[in-house]
């Protein structure tokens, strides 16, 4: 039976562990983090086993690296001898900015690498996961064990910075929008609970409209704005404040790491 190991149990590593368990309720999960005693609750939730890193490296067929990008090289340096003795592993990396070429240099030639870029919505099965690398067999394995995370999208590696900025950083921008909308609702007389619930539903519904009708967002916007009405007055204020440009600049800045 295939065994999966996860190294790094921060927010992303934990979310991926949960997604894997939801995708397959029998696959053995080996978990590792620097301080093993800090993830007992997660291990129990996903029916995984907290183990030392050397055991994980030796026993796992698929190894998911969920550590920070600046820790990748030092990890492989620290465990060089063990890793060089391993055969035929499939590695998954969520380290932003660390290329497939760089990753492949860290392991024996018979190992395969797939780069992943998930967003945090995988925690509830509504995420978006871009991936590149591997062959058709390894990609089918990825589909099998991450199907509960949301949508998996193959993209070329050169598109990773743009994807990261839009889909990886994007949820933070939407949270700001939801917060601002709910603040406005409270100012207008709604309770905080009402305002937040309404704002969330508006964002969810608008996204679904674009996706399901396949109409351009501008056409859908025009369908809401009537001549001289309240909506077009609000749109004028958004344009006056430069919202459209601010969103574009935020995503471009994220894609360039600035």
Q: Which sequence ranges carry the predicted segments?
A:
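Internal alpha-helical scaffold of NAD(P)-dependent oxidoreductase catalytic cores
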Residues: 45, 102-112, 128-163, 174-212, ...
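Aromatic-residue-lined binding/catalytic grooves and analogous aromatic/hydrophobic interfacial grooves
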Residues: 170
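NAD(P)+-binding Rossmann beta1-loop-alpha1 motif at the extreme N-terminus of oxidoreductases
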Residues: 1-58, 126-127, 186-187
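A short acidic, helix-capping loop that chelates divalent metal ions and anchors anionic groups
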Residues: 123-127, 162-164, 233
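Small-residue helix-packing motif on alpha-helices
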Residues: 39, 72, 191-199, 220
